[in-house]
Regions:
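Extended amphipathic ligand-handling, pore-lining, and cofactor/metal-binding catalytic surfaces
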Residues: 57, 111-414
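C-terminal motif of bacterial Sec signal peptides marking the signal peptidase cleavage site
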Residues: 17-21
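Bacterial N-terminal signal peptides that target proteins for export
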Residues: 1-9
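Low-complexity, Pro/Thr/Ser/Glu-rich flexible segments characteristic
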Residues: 28-58
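Beta-rich interaction/scaffold domains
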Residues: 54-119
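Bacterial signal peptide processing site
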Residues: 23-26
Length: 414
């Protein structure tokens, strides 16, 4: 009996110890995760804020827009006291952009080509803005171009010819397009005088005899503006004379043609035929090739000059030579009209070439560009021709044209 009681007590004690251990283990197991969770919350890495989709592009666009605004600010025709600083700021903003950001530049006038297009080596040009001018100055006035190679070949080519022919005269340069002056200054750090700057420079250097030789094609609106600028300075010099533009006097109608237009017609045609690889204009005609010389066009009364040039081509027997204009003024020089005339003549090959002193923006883009509204693209899209080629060369680089300017200058110096 006593033994049974001992066994029973031992069993109860073992059960109690088991229950006590199980309770202790359960409490400990529940407490460990709770203890571990506290430090986990303290050391957890903060989540990164989500970047809105497109925010990086927006930042790039903002920088591109800033550069575009600075470019638009210097795309103006008036020079101010802030112009030099604005040109520098526009270039600095462009240089700070990445290549990807530069492709986003788009303003009223600004685009990636403003600073990004390679137009040649500006260091080959001479702005001819030096002081130390002698008593006799020959000021060569051009509209201007931002295409470096064309500026050197066409404008500098004329200036060099005039300087060689007039060694006793100081040859200087002026552009009438401030927009172009700003472009060249901002991009290439080349400073070219506008008309006011050039005339002020001449007066400040004690010039007595001033001869102005415009490189303009005709007596158009730009020539009129040049005359107004010169007249305002006439009392600053002992004598002021202005030579004829390339095509000379305008004349009264399309049938009245002067010797200058004949000389230009012969010179540009001969150069175009040679560059196209033909021995003569007749050889080109037999090959079914026509030449289209493209001018700017104008609403000015001087637009009759283009009609006179077409008449002159006919008088010379140049049946496969046609005159067109970018602006389509006069009407018969519009692209559609010229295309029809070329097609009706039975010509299947077309060679486009500028009837412009400088092969600049109009020649490179409006005439020979890849856009659908360029003359080359429209002639090609018409399907009327087997081939359409473009010769990008200004009149100013043709020796016979340079000689004509020299003759015009000599005429007023006599």
């Amino acid at each position: 009996m006593r033994r049974n009681m001992s066994v029973l007590l031992a069993a109860l004690l073992a059960l109690a110890l088991c229950l006590s251990g199980c309770g202790s283990n359960g409490t400990s197991s529940a407490a460990e995760p709770a203890a571990d969770s506290a430090p986990a919350e303290e050391t957890q890495e903060p989540e990164e804020a989500e970047v809105p989709e497109g925010s990086e592009e927006a930042s790039d666009q903002e920088k591109a827009d800033e550069a575009a605004a600075l470019i638009d600010a210097i795309y103006v025709q008036q020079r101010t006291d802030e112009t030099d600083a604005q040109c520098a700021a526009a270039k600095a903003a462009w240089d700070a952009l990445t290549d990807a950001q530069k492709e986003l530049v788009e303003g009223e006038e600004a685009d990636p080509d403003y600073f990004g297009r390679d137009t040649g080596d500006a260091s080959k040009d001479d702005p001819r803005n030096q002081d130390e001018i002698r008593e006799n100055e020959l000021l060569v006035v051009s509209f201007g171009t931002s295409f470096n190679d064309s500026r050197v070949a066409d404008i500098k080519g004329i200036e060099d010819a005039l300087a060689a022919a007039n060694p006793d005269w100081s040859v200087r340069r002026a552009f009438t397009a401030q927009i172009i002056i700003n472009h060249v200054q901002a991009r290439d750090d080349e400073k070219i005088d506008n008309m006011q700057q050039a005339l002020d420079r001449a007066a400040a250097n004690g010039v007595k005899n001033l001869v102005v030789q415009p490189t303009h094609l005709m007596h158009g609106a730009e020539y009129d503006e040049l005359m107004e600028a010169v007249e305002a300075y006439e009392d600053r010099f002992e004598s002021v004379k202005v030579a004829e533009p390339l095509l000379g006097e305008v004349g009264t109608d399309a049938t009245v043609i002067n010797a200058d237009k004949k000389a230009v017609a012969e010179a540009v045609t001969a150069e175009a035929v040679k560059d196209a690889g033909y021995d003569s204009l007749n050889a080109a005609k037999e090959d079914g090739a026509a030449f289209v010389f493209l001018g700017h066009g104008t609403s000015h009364t001087a637009k009759v000059s283009y009609s006179q040039m077409q008449t002159q081509m006919g008088d010379l027997g140049y049946d496969n030579v046609f005159i067109g204009t970018v602006e389509g003024e006069p009407e018969e020089t519009a692209c559609e009209a010229v295309m029809e005339a070329v097609a009706e003549g039975g010509y299947r090959k077309v060679i486009l070439r500028p009837l412009m002193v400088v092969a600049g923006d109009h020649a490179n883009n409006d005439m020979a560009g890849d856009d659908e509204d360029s003359w080359k693209s429209m002639f090609t899209a018409s399907g009327k021709f087997d081939s359409v080629d473009a010769q990008i060369a200004g009149l100013g680089q043709i020796p016979a044209i340079q000689d004509l300017y020299v003759a015009h200058t000599a005429a007023v110096m006599e």
